[in-house]
């Protein structure tokens, strides 16, 4: 740093002196004696230096070295100071001009000093030789480093001396061998690296010294790649560089000065080398000693040398590798032939039209790996010539927008970016062409040279390769060959003409002879013509030349249009390819009259496209072929023909008009035109216009596929479809491929340029447009639009042509456009698209974008159909109002585009088609057939929850609602709107037609309403009137309303669809309508019958249950002042009813979330609506006696009293009568009581069996225990007598359970309760009746036990294995059941078989009473006995071998009958189990929680957010019947709104109901709560409260919320459904290609992995794992007096009830937690790899790529289906009673959301003993998140007496057990029962450990193993399958002797049948639960209970 500062100081001093003298105008310094100014500036500079040094500003320069380096490089080049960039004099340390002549010694001294200073740059360690020198110093000592430094110094000095002294004999050969120098240096480096890789410190020999010296010497000479480009610009002198010489006068002076400079460099370098040696000997050695001994690092010597050796070796290797690309390939090849690096001639093209390189031999140079044409450049991949022109440019890229305002025709979505041209590249790959040794341009140039004529003339020799003859025959035979070209029919008619034609086209004829022949022949024809000039003006001169042709008959051939088009193409190509040098002519100026007018060829296009029937087509075609060629050669300066003379004459206007008339007359007289008279133009003009219009429409239509034609660039996708998804026969496909490949011209279409017509110089223009419409114009003259006399002349000023073709579909081919296109390609495509990282990001982004939409936001198939029909009808309606039908091409446009571009059409296209065109191009898309969802971008219709609690609401309906309710209040009184059902379609959100209530099924839930106008027209009015009329009549009339109206409306959409298919098939329509109507009526009748049966059961059951239902104090209140409506309906009343109908279903009720998931399907909703309708009708019939009567207040009160008394009498009479007739009831009448009895009998029987079995075993072991068992039996009977109370299971159906003192009753007591106890009044217990019933039951029970008990044989035991009773209640493990006032202790034996003594039992009972306050309502858990794996395998083997045997050989005995009976028994038992679960488990719990679940809401804060579309608004159950008067009066002034169950509306109640349903309405309070809805359309116009203004917006595009959202109580937790309900069919693929850039080869889609279409927007959805989450019902914190009663649920219950005060999972988690370790399907080791059929379909019905493998596939998303129940471990200890009691002590917690977690890594268990916890439970590694406290509001509410043990935190899965804290309240009995905890180890396990013969490894096997490049979703994991290794069998002689011979199974057994049946039972239970847990059923059942409770008591 000091050196640098000193250098800059010296230069700045000199600069300062010069500038100062210049300012004072004093001469510059002539010597070094003027010290005044220098000293002054020197002082200032020293001050500046110290200032910079102490302020540490020099550190800035060090830190900013990466930024300074470019400045240094530029300073070197521009000769400014590197050390100080502020001054302009660079390295002029001393001026050479000072005393140059006067004192040579001073100059020599100056140069010597400059050399010393410049030697600094030579010693900088910038080259490999310096690195090697440094390594020699470090590794091999001072001597080796010194020798290496000398070698480097000698090499540098030699090179500098040879340059400065001008030793050409050395410099020029050495520089010309640059490749040799490079290779020599590289080889030396590689050898050095090889030798020194294992080199250590050693003593040097003389030979090694020379090696070291020579290596560095040669490297310094060869390696100029690092330092010399920079060192050449470094110098401290006034010269440009170090290597520059100095100006001298004579030769001795030259030697002296330059020798002094070189000596200075040598001296400086040698001094620096010596300095380095000194530094290495003293300071560096001391630093090394300090590092190795004293520093804290204390690196050992070996590691020190190892690190240094590694560092230097790698640095040297990096230098060697970095020098590889120093000489490029282009320089290496082109340097020997004299080209400079990056010579521009390498990239130069031959011409603008010919894209070949000028030097074809070096065409492969300067190609990047990602070059846009690298796939088809002939130098890289030699292709056939026809592919090169097609793909040489991306001509479809719209670069013309930047150039002169000419636009391409293609839209932005149809542009092609290379990767979507893969089908084209595939066709190129499939070409039958081998790679040629020579590139294409070489071969083509060779061919053209060989094809030259033998004696070329002077004119053709200049362009030999493209002579006219070569081009002519190449065009003729290679491209436009046709058999008619060679027809020789004309040879017989006119031999001379044929001969001339043959000569003119003969390959042997030279150009000169051909030209002479043609000119003379043409002159002869003109002289012989009868019409003279007029014949020349016409395009068709065959009339004069061949008069015999006029008399021949005109024939039109079918292939005429193709022949003519081929000829047209041929002539057009001849015109462009003819030698232009032969066609030079003088150009004369045209008249300005015609020059001012610009003529477009569109005007002439129709004329040229006319197809005239030619006479004797073959003859005339062959003549035309000749004539077209001859005519081009005719018009040359040499041919002085009459035609040219005539053209050059100027005609006056009058003469020109006469000429036109004569031409027209002659044409009409000599030629018969065949154009139709009625058309202005020939028919083919219109046909061609239509075709062109269709081609345009092809790019804009909504067609799913585009037609694959040769010229159409767009439909690459269809080629993909054909190759990958459709199966064609090979012959047909091969033929088509060959046909397309043969059309070379289509694929060779270049980027076209404008065709320019240049007029001849001396030509007169003839205005014959009228004439040309009727004359027969030769089609082949496309380049001659003004007739046959105008010939295209190509000159220098071709741009000034008059007639220019339109360029709207052309790409401009010019320098500017190509430059723009290339720049766009480089900037956009190469950087953004072709980068692999960006392509990967784009793929992920597109995947995420397509997967961001929830699956539930899709419309259903039927909704899409209905929406499509409505939009179609709406657009058809719009078409009638518009002028489209008067358009010229209306039919074509309508069929191609699909109708007009109205607003509805635009919305439809945007929604259904989307903008997936580019995605279709760039990404693979799976086609699919059938009815599937269509992916849309904007979804106005959401389908989040298919239940009726989260309906959307639009704010515009609010005002109508309030207006309507006011009107309704004034006009209506006792109207029950129940018989009019208004359906809210949960997916389409449209209010359907109100029809009379009946049980009907909905075909399409969106199909009844076609437009909103129908609700406002006469149809709605008629329906409303008929509805009100039916309301005023009796209830029977309402139900018997004709259903035909609705049947027609629901079939409307389906009829439209079928009519569109069979629009003319009337018989089909008739049959279809009759069939559909009959089927619908039949279905309705069946449903009605079924519903009636169910309702009868429900009524009997509810009536029988009267004694258990408490009375409600609510009675209907009626207003006598309001009269019922008359028959004459006023308009106000109709309007009010209209509003109520339209809004009755919009206000949803809050569904209380029960245990079961809220997954419903469409059928459940339909059935539920039908059931509700029936229930409402019957409710109205039973409850609404006073609906149509006019009553005063006194009358209504009297009637109410009488009604209450009567109902009480009737109900009590009914129940007592029912109790008496209970005994006489038939056994088949299976109600709840029957099932309860049956369950009790089964339970008693099985427990008795078990107890007997147990007693026998104990008696065998110890005979003394028999007496003890008798003693306990007597004790039991005493318990029955002493502890028996009035408790019944049916008490759970009571509203008020009698609260007595807590009693603990043995559970065996409860098994002997009387059956009819529930139906007897509690006050009058009939003892005789009870005993009679009991004895009766005992008699029947003993009878059945004796008669029907059958010993099961060993044969029958095999079939019994599938019995469901085995799983139902096989064993009863000890359990605790906590009821409201009762606790039962189940078993009275300990686990060791000993009986509990009386004292122990009493202690445990006392302990239970002490703990009663801590227990929540626990579930009665019955442990299903799980079969061990051994027994499961044994059963499966039996079944497997039996099935195989069944198919091999038939049994002659009764095995077949037994099998059939067994199957029937299994089905019956499955049904029986469902029945049992329904009656015993679900219905009692459901009724019990009915009242408690009437959870209430507090006042909510309502915020008006008009731009949201989703909200869930909870509401409450309404259980008290009121009249409509009550509803309307309290709508705006209530805190609690109660509505009757007959109203199909749900109003939010806002007061807290505790026990009674008496409604108190506080006056004066006006608050309302409104649910949130959405309308059908996405547009909203209304007031936005947050913006404070009126807005009109699209809600889908808005980020704001919309609607009225109700802020829920924070204590409530509302869970939404999982985002995907059902998924599409699983498509399969594997990514097997190994090509890096092979984009979407269809052959790689091998169907091995299952996936589905992932949802959009799943990133923002907080996904909760379904099985890890329990659906919680939280009641309010303040309602402590409301208690939920937990039912005794079925032993086969699927999901246990989860109430708010209990921990749902406690017992299950404790007892069965180890089951998660093992899996059910251990035997599924072989997974069949079946290929699934992936259906295909049109593009618009499937738009998602198939290779998006998602996390949320159904089999992985729902763990119930994925991870089945595990087997418990054999070492699991039976849990004691107190452990369960302790576990039930935990409090319920806040239900946290759970995340997807990674699976546990497999643990290698090498001879490990399984670790057993103290309490006998094995906790798995993969456990649930558990919480222990409940956060209610801001306070922690706990149900424990003890304090909270843990915070409200989730604990992660842990392998450690959560140890329970010892409780001080635990008694001695508890410790006694928990003392015996040791579980004995399996002796087989110990034997295994001793033998050490087997290593047990739990290996995870992947279900699907992805091959190379397989996809896994980001963040997902590959799912593993644990396969258990077989254990060693124990050698047991007795077991072996007892074994039977069994058939060995061939493959692993898959227990599918059992699992599927079990799964189906679960699904049925869920569906039944959901069907009966809906809000409406709750209300109806409650109404029946209220009806019974409110009836007067029996007198």
Curated annotation (Swiss-Prot):
Keywords, in A-Z order: Chloroplast, Membrane, Plastid, Transmembrane, Transmembrane helix
Predominant subcellular localization, coarse grouping: plastid
Segments for region (Disordered): 1418-1441, 1848-1883
Topology versus the membrane: Multi-pass membrane protein
Record annotation: effect of changing residue 1610 to A: In strain: CC-503
Keyword hit for Lyase: no
Function according to Swiss-Prot or TrEMBL: Essential for cell growth. May be involved in binding chloroplast DNA to either the chloroplast envelope or the thylakoid membrane.
Family: Belongs to the ycf78 family.
UniProt protein name: Uncharacterized membrane protein ycf78
């Amino acid at each position: 740093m000091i050196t640098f500062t000193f250098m800059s100081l010296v230069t700045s001093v000199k600069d300062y002196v010069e500038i100062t003298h210049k300012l004072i105008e004093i001469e510059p310094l002539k010597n070094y004696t003027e010290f005044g100014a220098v000293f002054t500036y020197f002082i200032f500079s020293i001050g500046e230096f110290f200032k910079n040094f102490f302020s540490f500003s020099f550190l800035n320069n060090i830190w900013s070295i990466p930024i300074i380096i470019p400045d240094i490089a530029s300073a070197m080049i521009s000769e400014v100071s590197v050390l100080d960039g502020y001054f302009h004099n660079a390295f002029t340390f001393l001026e050479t001009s000072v005393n140059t002549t006067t004192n040579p010694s001073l100059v020599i001294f100056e140069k010597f000093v400059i050399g010393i200073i410049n030697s600094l740059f030579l010693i900088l360690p910038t080259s490999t030789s310096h690195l090697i020198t440094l390594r020699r110093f470090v590794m091999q000592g001072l001597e080796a480093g010194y020798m290496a430094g000398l070698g480097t110094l000698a090499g540098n000095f030699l090179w500098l001396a040879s340059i400065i002294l001008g030793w050409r004999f050395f410099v020029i050969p050495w520089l010309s061998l640059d490749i040799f120098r490079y290779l020599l240096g590289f080889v030396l480096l590689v050898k050095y690296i090889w030798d020194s890789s294992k080199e250590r410190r050693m003593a040097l020999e003389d030979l090694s010294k020379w090696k070291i010296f020579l290596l560095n010497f040669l490297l310094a000479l060869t390696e100029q790649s690092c330092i010399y480009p920079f060192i050449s610009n470094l110098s401290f002198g006034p010269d440009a560089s170090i290597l520059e010489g100095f100006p001298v006068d004579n030769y001795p002076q030259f030697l002296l000065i330059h020798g002094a400079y070189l000596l200075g460099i040598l001296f400086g370098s040698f001094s620096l080398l010596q300095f380095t040696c000194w530094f290495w000997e003293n300071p560096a050695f001391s630093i090394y000693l300090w590092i190795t001994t004293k520093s804290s690092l204390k690196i050992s010597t070996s590691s020190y040398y190892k690190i240094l050796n590694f560092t230097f070796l790698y640095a040297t290797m990096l230098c060697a590798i970095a020098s590889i690309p120093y000489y490029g390939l282009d320089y290496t090849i082109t340097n020997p032939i004299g080209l400079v690096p990056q010579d521009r001639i390498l990239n130069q093209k031959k011409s603008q039209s010919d894209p070949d390189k000028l030097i074809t031999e070096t065409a492969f140079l300067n190609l990047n790996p990602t070059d846009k044409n690298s796939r088809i450049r002939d130098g890289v991949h030699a292709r056939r010539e026809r592919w090169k022109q097609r793909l040489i440019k991306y001509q479809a890229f719209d670069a013309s927008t930047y150039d002169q305002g000419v636009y391409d025709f293609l839209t932005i979505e149809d542009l092609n970016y290379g990767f979507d041209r893969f089908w084209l590249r595939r066709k190129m790959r499939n070409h039958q062409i081998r790679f040629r040794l020579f590139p294409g341009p070489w071969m083509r140039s060779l061919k053209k040279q060989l094809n030259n004529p033998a004696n070329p003339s002077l004119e053709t020799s200049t362009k030999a390769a493209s002579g006219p003859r070569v081009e002519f025959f190449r065009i003729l035979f290679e491209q436009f060959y046709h058999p008619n070209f060679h027809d020789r029919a004309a040879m017989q008619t006119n031999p001379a003409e044929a001969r001339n034609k043959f000569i003119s086209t003969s390959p042997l004829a030279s150009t000169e002879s051909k030209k002479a022949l043609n000119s003379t022949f043409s002159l002869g024809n003109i002289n012989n013509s009868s019409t003279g000039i007029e014949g020349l003006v016409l395009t068709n001169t065959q009339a004069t030349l061949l008069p015999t042709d006029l008399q021949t008959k005109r024939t039109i051939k079918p292939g005429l249009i193709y022949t003519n088009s081929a000829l047209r193409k041929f002539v057009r190509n001849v015109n462009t390819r003819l030698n232009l040098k032969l066609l030079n002519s003088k150009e004369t100026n045209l008249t300005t009259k015609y020059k001012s007018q610009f003529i477009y060829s569109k005007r002439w296009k129709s004329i040229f496209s006319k197809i005239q029937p030619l006479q004797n087509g073959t003859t005339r075609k062959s003549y035309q072929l000749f004539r077209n060629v001859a005519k081009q050669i005719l018009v040359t300066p040499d041919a002085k023909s009459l035609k040219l003379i005539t053209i050059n004459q100027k005609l006056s206007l009058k003469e020109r008009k006469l000429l036109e008339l004569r031409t027209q007359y002659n044409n009409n007289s000599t030629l018969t035109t065949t154009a139709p008279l009625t058309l202005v133009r020939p028919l083919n003009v219109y046909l061609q216009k239509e075709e062109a219009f269709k081609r345009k429409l092809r790019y804009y239509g909504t067609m799913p596929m585009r037609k694959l034609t040769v010229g159409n660039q767009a439909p690459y996708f269809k080629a993909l479809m054909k190759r990958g998804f459709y199966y064609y026969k090979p012959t047909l496909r091969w033929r088509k491929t060959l046909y397309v490949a043969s059309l070379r011209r289509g694929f060779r279409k270049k980027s076209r340029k404008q065709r320019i017509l240049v007029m001849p110089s001396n030509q007169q223009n003839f205005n014959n447009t009228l004439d040309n419409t009727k004359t027969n114009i030769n089609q082949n003259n496309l380049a001659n639009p003004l007739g046959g006399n105008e010939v295209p002349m190509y000159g220098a000023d071709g741009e000034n042509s008059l007639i220019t073709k339109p360029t709207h579909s052309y790409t401009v081919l010019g320098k500017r456009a190509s430059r723009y296109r290339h720049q766009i390609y480089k900037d956009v495509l190469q950087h953004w698209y072709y980068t692999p990282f960006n392509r990967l990001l784009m793929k992920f982004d597109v995947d995420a974008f397509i997967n961001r939409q929830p699956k539930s936001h899709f419309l259903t198939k039927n909704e899409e159909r209905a929406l499509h029909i409505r939009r179609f009808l709406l657009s058809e309606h719009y078409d009638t109002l518009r002028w489209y039908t008067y358009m010229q091409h209306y039919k074509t446009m309508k069929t191609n585009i699909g109708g007009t571009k109205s607003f509805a059409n635009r919305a439809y296209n945007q929604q259904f088609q989307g903008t997936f065109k580019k995605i279709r191009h760039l990404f693979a898309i799976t086609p699919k057939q059938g009815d599937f969802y269509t992916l849309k971008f904007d979804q106005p219709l959401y389908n989040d929850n298919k239940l009726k609690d989260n309906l959307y609401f639009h704010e515009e309906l609010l005002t109508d609602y309030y207006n309507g309710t006011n009107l309704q209040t004034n006009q209506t009184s006792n109207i029950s709107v129940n018989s009019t059902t208004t359906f809210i379609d949960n997916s389409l959100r449209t209010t359907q037609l109100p029809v009379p209530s009946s049980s009907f099924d909905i075909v399409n839930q969106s199909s009844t309403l076609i437009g909103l106008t129908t609700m406002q027209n006469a149809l709605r009015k008629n329906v409303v009137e008929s509805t009100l009329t039916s309301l005023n009549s009796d209830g029977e009339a309402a139900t018997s309303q004709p259903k035909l109206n609705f049947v027609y409306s629901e079939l409307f959409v389906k009829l439209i669809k079928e009519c569109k298919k069979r629009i003319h098939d009337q018989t089909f329509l008739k049959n279809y309508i009759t069939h559909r109507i009959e089927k619908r009526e039949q279905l309705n009748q069946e449903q009605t019958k079924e519903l009636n049966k169910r309702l009868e059961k429900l009524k009997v059951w509810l009536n029988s249950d009267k004694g258990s239902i408490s009375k409600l104090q609510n009675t209907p209140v009626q207003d006598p002042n309001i009269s019922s409506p008359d028959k004459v309906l006023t308009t106000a009343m109709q309007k009010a009813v209209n509003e109520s109908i339209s809004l009755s279903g919009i206000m949803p009720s809050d569904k209380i979330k029960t245990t079961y998931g809220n997954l419903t399907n469409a059928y459940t909703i339909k059935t539920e609506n039908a059931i509700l309708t029936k229930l409402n009708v019957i409710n109205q019939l039973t409850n609404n006696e006073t609906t149509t009567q006019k009553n005063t207040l006194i009358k209504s009160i009297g009637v109410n009293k009488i009604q209450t008394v009567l109902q009480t009498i009737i109900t009590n009479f009914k129940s007592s009568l029912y109790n008496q007739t209970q005994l006489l009831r038939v056994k088949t009448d299976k109600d709840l009581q029957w099932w309860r009895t049956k369950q009790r009998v089964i339970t008693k029987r099985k427990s008795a069996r078990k107890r007997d079995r147990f007693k026998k075993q104990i008696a065998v072991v110890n005979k003394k225990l028999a007496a003890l068992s008798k003693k306990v039996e007597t004790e039991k009977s005493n318990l029955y007598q002493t502890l028996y109370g009035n408790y019944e299971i049916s008490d759970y159906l009571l509203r008020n359970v009698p609260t007595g003192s807590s009693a603990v009753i043995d559970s065996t007591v409860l098994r002997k309760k009387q059956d009819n106890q529930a139906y007897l009044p509690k006050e009058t217990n009939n003892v005789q009746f009870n005993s009679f019933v009991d004895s009766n039951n005992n008699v029947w029970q003993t009878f059945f036990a004796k008669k029907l008990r059958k010993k099961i044989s060993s044969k029958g035991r095999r079939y019994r294995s599938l019995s469901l009773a085995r799983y139902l209640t096989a064993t009863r493990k000890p359990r605790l059941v906590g009821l409201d006032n009762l606790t039962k202790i189940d078993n009275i034996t300990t686990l060791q078989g000993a009986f509990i003594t009386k004292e122990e039992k009493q202690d445990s009972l006392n302990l239970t009473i002490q703990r009663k306050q801590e227990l929540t309502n626990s579930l009665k858990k019955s442990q299903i006995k799980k079969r061990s794996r051994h027994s499961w395998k044994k059963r499966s083997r039996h079944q497997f071998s039996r099935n195989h045997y069944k198919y091999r050989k038939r049994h002659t005995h009764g095995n077949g009958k037994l099998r059939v009976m067994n199957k029937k028994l299994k089905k019956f038992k499955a049904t029986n189990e469902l029945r049992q679960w329904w009656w015993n488990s679900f219905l009692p719990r459901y009724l019990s929680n009915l009242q408690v679940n009437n959870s209430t809401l507090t006042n909510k804060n309502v915020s008006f957010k008009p731009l949201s579309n989703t909200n869930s608004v909870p509401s409450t159950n309404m259980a008290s019947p009121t009249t409509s008067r009550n509803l309307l009066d309290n709508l705006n002034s209530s805190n609690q709104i109660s509505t009757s169950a007959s109203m199909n509306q749900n109003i939010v109640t806002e007061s807290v109901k505790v026990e009674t349903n008496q409604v108190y309405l506080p006056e004066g309070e006006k608050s309302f709560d409104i649910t949130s809805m959405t309308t059908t359309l996405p547009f909203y116009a209304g007031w936005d409260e947050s913006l404070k203004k009126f807005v009109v917006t699209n809600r889908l595009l808005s980020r704001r919320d919309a609607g009225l959202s109700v802020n829920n109580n924070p204590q409530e937790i509302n869970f939404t459904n999982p985002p995907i309900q059902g998924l599409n069919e699983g498509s399969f693929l594997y990514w097997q290609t190994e090509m890096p850039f092979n984009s979407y080869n269809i052959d790689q889609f091998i169907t091995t992995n299952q996936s589905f279409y992932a949802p959009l927007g799943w990133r923002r959805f907080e996904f909760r794992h379904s099985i890890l989450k329990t659906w919680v019902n939280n009641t309010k914190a303040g309602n402590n007096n409301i208690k939920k009663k937990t039912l005794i649920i079925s032993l086969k219950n699927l999901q246990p009830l989860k109430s708010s005060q209990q921990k749902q999972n406690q017992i299950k988690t404790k007892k069965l937690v180890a089951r998660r370790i093992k899996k059910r399907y251990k035997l599924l080791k072989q997974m069949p790899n079946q290929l699934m059929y992936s259906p295909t379909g049109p593009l618009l019905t499937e738009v998602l790529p198939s290779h998006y493998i998602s996390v949320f596939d159904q089999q992985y998303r729902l763990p119930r289906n994925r991870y089945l129940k595990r087997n418990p471990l054999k070492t699991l200890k039976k849990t004691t009673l107190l452990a369960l009691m302790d576990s039930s002590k935990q409090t319920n917690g806040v239900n946290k959301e759970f995340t997807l977690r990674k699976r546990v890594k497999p643990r290698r268990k090498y001879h490990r003993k399984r670790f057993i916890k103290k309490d006998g439970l094995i906790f798995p590694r993969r456990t649930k998140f558990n919480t222990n406290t409940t956060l209610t509001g801001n306070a922690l509410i706990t149900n424990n007496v003890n304090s909270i043990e843990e915070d409200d935190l989730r604990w992660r899965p842990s392998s450690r057990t959560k140890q329970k804290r010892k409780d001080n309240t635990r008694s001695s009995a508890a410790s006694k029962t928990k003392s015996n905890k040791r579980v004995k180890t399996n002796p087989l396990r110990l034997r295994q450990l001793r033998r050490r013969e087997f290593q047990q490894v739990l290996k995870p096997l992947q279900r699907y193993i992805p091959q190379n490049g397989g996809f896994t979703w980001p963040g997902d994991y590959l799912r593993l399958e644990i396969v258990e290794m077989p254990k060693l069998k124990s050698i047991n002689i007795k077991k072996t002797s007892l074994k039977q011979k069994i058939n060995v199974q061939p493959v692993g057994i898959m227990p599918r049948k059992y699992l599927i049946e079990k799964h189906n039972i679960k699904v049925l239970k869920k569906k039944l639960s959901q069907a009966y847990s809906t809000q409406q059923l709750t209300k109806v059942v409650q109404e029946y209970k209220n009806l019974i409770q409110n009836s007067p008591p029996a007198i």
